[in-house]
């Protein structure tokens, strides 16, 4: 793209404003007007148009020149007093008479090349836009793939570990229950041992009491036997004394007196003693039987009382054991329920933490995706604006091309000769005057539009 700024002044007094871009459009020979029309117009049409409308002719709205002329278009007009306009510009005044040089085809070719370059530029930008969209889609997919990696294996590992932890907790709970059951069984056996010890002590006490009674009975029997022996000895002593007394009396009396008395026969002492002995033996036997019966009755009563007490004690102990077992079972169940409650609370806390973390990750991912979406929308809006700008540029360039073509066609009809072919024919180019059907400013306005 080639353009330059010109601040040279025209001999007629019109000065190009600094910054006004003088773009040479076509390599058409300058047609200088006759000397009589030199005071009417001496300025180039395109320069007047650019200077009057303050429009950068041939430039894009982006501030870049869109016209690149061949080197032949930069040769100055050899006529003295001209506006320093290149000599191959085909329009030098508004009153030319169908005069065109031999560069018309080159100019049209240049304009066509310019249009082709612009269309190529548009196609290139569209292709770049499509490539950018493809790149954005790929990057969004890659970003999704990087932002959302596959955590399924980790999740499976975590689930397996959680299952193992739950199994371990259940095994621990089962072992705790077994330990509690063993403790309860040990307590039961300890209670049974204590009850057996108490029963053994009771039996030992009963045995001691019975042994004491038996000893008392044995002592009573020994006393009775001693009394019996003493009575027997007394009987024997009495008998021996009686016999001795009888012998003494017989010895004292001798045979002096023989007195016969008609008396009843004497009582048989042996028989009497035998009867007494039998009576005493019967009494001893009766007393012994009575003592034995009393001892048996007392023993049976005490044993029955002990048995009833032991039965009542066993019933109470069995009830106590049942109640203790029930209490222990309820305590174990309560502990198991507490353990289950703690496990469920821990699982709930872990699930809440895990889902809270996942929710935070999802929210961060959503925020990232929303930011990316906003960036993509901003990029799309920017590209759409650039595309609209390019479409506007395209429309303006097409309008410029149409304007240039109309100008070329009108000047082709208006310039009949080339008075600038010889240096001596004219000394200066007349100023551009009014033309039928419009002015250069009007053309500039149409170009600006």
UniProtKB/Swiss-Prot annotation:
Site feature (Stutter) residues: 353
Protein keywords: Coiled coil, Intermediate filament, Keratin
Cross-referenced InterPro entries: IF_conserved, IF_rod_dom, Keratin_I
Residue numbers spanned by region Linker 1: 140-150
Renumbered residue ranges of the record's region Coil 2: 268-411
Domain IF rod residues, every copy: 104-415
Ranges where the record places region Linker 12: 252-267
Top-level division of the source organism's lineage: Eukaryota
Start and end residues of each stretch annotated as Coil 1B: 151-251
GO biological process: epithelial cell differentiation; intermediate filament organization
Region (Head): 1-104
Chain positions covered by the region annotation Coil 1A: 105-139
Tail as annotated region, ranges: 416-449
One GO location term (cellular component): extracellular exosome
Molecular function terms, GO-annotated: structural molecule activity
Additional note from the record: There are two types of hair/microfibrillar keratin, I (acidic) and II (neutral to basic).
Family classification: Belongs to the intermediate filament family.
Protein name: Keratin, type I cuticular Ha7
Species of the source: Homo sapiens
